[in-house]
Amino acid sequence: MFLVDSHCHLDGLDYQSLHKNVDDVLAKAAARDVKFCLAVATTLPGYRTMRELVGVRDNVVFSCGVHPLNQDEEYDVDDLRRLAAEEGVVAMGETGLDYFYTPETKPRQQESFRNHIRIGRELNKPVIVHTLSLIHISEPT
């Protein structure tokens, strides 16, 4: 048996004091029977950085998206579509709705979430959804 890390942020690890590099991280994971990783992006610049950092590997695939807490800057939807269509990208996201920390970006979060779902449908890719503080929401998004 082996394990799959279905949601890791390889671009957000401490490469100064905890890990030497991505090879080191993946070797440590493999030593604990984690043989495959889905590297999840939270911004489009972060996705690009992560792709460059990780490179092409047999044991890592990617998602491409904009996290709801990263809606302070606009992004190009066509850029999202183009990046999400790249080889090795198997999912959209991390996207979703998070009104707990940034309720002021609610309209932007909703529009972004719709864009991710729409592109996911176009590209036939699943969507990684982040939700927080949505239990009592009764309005449509």
Kindly give the residue locations of the regions a language model identified:
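Mid-domain alpha/beta scaffold segments of enzyme catalytic cores
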Residues: M1-S138
